[in-house]
Amino acid sequence: MSLSNFNLQSKVLLHPLVLFQIIDAYERRAKDVPEVLGTLLGTVAGKTGRIEITNCFSVVHRMHGDNNCHIDLDLKYDNDMLELAQIAYPQEKVLGWFSTGKSVSAAAVELHEYYERQCHNGQPLHLLMDTSLRGQRMNTRIFCAVATGVPGGTKGLMFSLLPMDIYFGSPDIVAMRHMGRQCAQPTKDAGRLLPELEQVVDATKDIQQKLDLVLRYINDILNRKRRPDNTVGRALHDVLTSVPMVEAERFRHMFNTNMRDLLMSLTLSSMIKTQLQLSERLSNMVDA
């Protein structure tokens, strides 16, 4: 299924990472830029037609004309960012563009024409995020353009809504649960994240509790305290057979290697975070 075969019943799956990237771009925008826009990346399954928006990046632009109906994009920046993104994630393709605002902008037709060429295989999507927090919600909608007009007469585009779901993968669920706990029980140091190793400890404790529950269930079956359930038995069998048999010494070596990699990643990410904070403060000092 290509993007040109969209109908108003097509469903789009949006990864939460995209929302956070748009919010981050909006918070970091220049003072004279009221809204942000950028390129959407993702995949379209050929057989099922499942559309997933998995990534995005903002694009430098300038609005002009009456009611900001015209737009100039930094095409070199857009192409460079697209090349870098496809080096990291070659399976992701251009699906359309995002923008912030309360409604579809007057420049949407020009953007549609540009991203129609970028998509190569059909019609682009338009993700609109309302950052005004009306009703304490950040309303997010997906549009596709539908051609309107009469044969031989004036033609135009009408942006129609598509159904959309927020898709949470396993890593997304872990991150959202962590953020939920942080919101419910904020730390004294505002904005401070718990060390990643504490998340590993929490996950290990959770696995230990589930293993204890499984062991109690098996012991109750063996001691005839509870009736066996074939469905549960098959599920446990599938879980156990899916785990490869690894010697204790080899497992310890693998675990320690992964832990060293994690510590190295934490060190590098902390250095990058510090460098970004210094760069942002220096930039603010120059602007002031």
From Swiss-Prot:
Pfam families: JAB (PF01398), MitMem_reg (PF13012)
InterPro entries: eIF3f, EIF3F/CSN6-like_C, JAMM/MPN+_dom, MPN
MPN domain mapped to chain residues: 12-149
Alphabetical list of Gene3D superfamilies matching this protein: Cytidine Deaminase, domain 2
Main localization (coarse): cytoplasm
Keyword tags: Cytoplasm, Initiation factor, Protein biosynthesis
GO CC aspect terms: eukaryotic 43S preinitiation complex; eukaryotic 48S preinitiation complex; eukaryotic translation initiation factor 3 complex, eIF3m
Localization (cell): Cytoplasm
Keyword Cytoplasm part of the UniProt annotation: yes
MF (Gene Ontology): metallopeptidase activity; translation initiation factor activity; translation initiation factor binding
Disulphide bridges, residue numbers: none
A single BP term in Gene Ontology: formation of cytoplasmic translation initiation complex
Its job: Component of the eukaryotic translation initiation factor 3 (eIF-3) complex, which is involved in protein synthesis of a specialized repertoire of mRNAs and, together with other initiation factors, stimulates binding of mRNA and methionyl-tRNAi to the 40S ribosome. The eIF-3 complex specifically targets and initiates translation of a subset of mRNAs involved in cell proliferation.
Family from the record: Belongs to the eIF-3 subunit F family.
Subunit structure as annotated in this protein's UniProt entry: Component of the eukaryotic translation initiation factor 3 (eIF-3) complex. The eIF-3 complex interacts with pix.
Name of the protein in its database record: Eukaryotic translation initiation factor 3 subunit F-2
